[in-house]
Amino acid sequence: MGILFSHCSGGREKEDKISKTDRAVLNLKIQRDKLKNYQTQVLEIAIAKECSKAGKKNQALLALKKKKYQEKMLDESFANLQNIEELIANVEQAEIQVRIFESLKQGNESLKEIQKEMSLEDVENLMEETAEAIQYQNDISEALSGKFSKEEEDDLLNELDEMEKQLNAQQYPKVPETQLPKIELPIEDAIEEGKQRKSTTNGLNHILIIACIINHIF
């Protein structure tokens, strides 16, 4: 009993899954198969009657009339069969088109949901912020790499010339008018003293130049 009930319930579930379109197509195919079987039976009956009653004129004439009538019915059945075949094809094609439409509809709804999360204004703002960040990074790279325009380089060179002039003026003061007493030193000591003075002066010059350039940059 339980097995029977399970079979019945399973059959109902399968029926629920069958759509109206499926039932219509199934009925059309059943009618098509019946027409095909009828065509075969009519041909067999017509031939049998014609052969069995050919010896009698009246019966042969009646058989021919029946055969003619059956041929007309066959022609009509062929036409109906063709119409049924076309109708089945149209129904199946319409069902495919409905499925395609539903798929397109679902895809369109999904696309709209995605577009709600990513508006055009948000994309434009993101692109603008990205461009600004890239430009800022390029400016930092140029500053760190020491690239200057021609005008800036000319200004730096002029500033360097002015500093050198000031340093030279400070390095070489005016010669006093009074004559200083001569101090004789050994030749080796005089040469060594001159080298030390020159080294000290050059070192100070370089330090001052570097300090001015750093001050100008920052």
Swiss-Prot record:
Assembly description: Probable core component of the endosomal sorting required for transport complex III (ESCRT-III).
Functional summary from the UniProt entry: Probable core component of the endosomal sorting required for transport complex III (ESCRT-III) which is involved in multivesicular bodies (MVBs) formation and sorting of endosomal cargo proteins into MVBs. MVBs contain intraluminal vesicles (ILVs) that are generated by invagination and scission from the limiting membrane of the endosome and are delivered to lysosomes enabling degradation of membrane proteins.
The gene coding this protein: chmp6
Location(s), subcellular: Endosome membrane
PANTHER family: CHARGED MULTIVESICULAR BODY PROTEIN (PTHR22761), CHARGED MULTIVESICULAR BODY PROTEIN 6 (PTHR22761:SF5)
Disulfide bond annotation, renumbered to this chain: none
Keyword Protein transport: yes
Main localization (coarse): membrane
One GO term describing the cellular component: ESCRT III complex
Homology family: Belongs to the SNF7 family.
A GO BP annotation: vesicle budding from membrane
Entry coiled-coil feature ranges: 15-42, 70-172
Keyword terms, alphabetized: Coiled coil, Endosome, Membrane, Protein transport, Transport
Topological category with respect to the lipid bilayer: Peripheral membrane protein
Entry protein name: Charged multivesicular body protein 6
